[in-house]
Amino acid sequence: MNIIQEQQRINQQVNNIVTRIFKDVEAHKICRFHLSELPESNNWQNHPNIDPVFKKHLDVLNHYKRDCLYWFNCDTKEDAEILNQALNAYRSKKGQNGYRVVPTTNKLDGKEKTIYVGVRRGNTAKNPKLTNIMGRINQHLGYYHQPKTQGLQFLHWAKDLEMYLTLYVVHFDDNLDSILYVIEKAVAKHLVPHCGRH
């Protein structure tokens, strides 16, 4: 087996997938929402996917049962910088009562509008009412009772910011096994998110 040729073949396959993702990025747009729209959790009894007003943004995710790639964008680079500064201020509270684990700062240069890029394996979440991707987005929005589960946790530090976020989700035709994480890194290299290890 020629490892170099195999690596080149895999790289070409990943490049083709990434090119297709960005060729029609609007097809992957799930919703645009204002941070102030995030519903109160009412002691974990309410979640974005069941809130009568907010769920319209996310309903489609409960039909996504295969591997997914997702990212959150701000409207502008300036908004992304403001959001990242607020996240850094929240990070400074680590160790305090009520702190929830958030992603690390991305050390890459050239950051633009993207806050975070992630992937979620297909299948159904532990909660039978959620797909894996819906469960993961709930965690990022801040609606998970375990504070040690890493996520963006927007409800806990960003609800008062005057800005919109857009969620993009790529729902793949098949489950991609280990190549999913290679695609995540390639997309993150393209989008240069403000946080997450890429």
Pin down the residues of each PLM region:
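Boundary/linker segments flanking structured domains
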Residues: 1-198
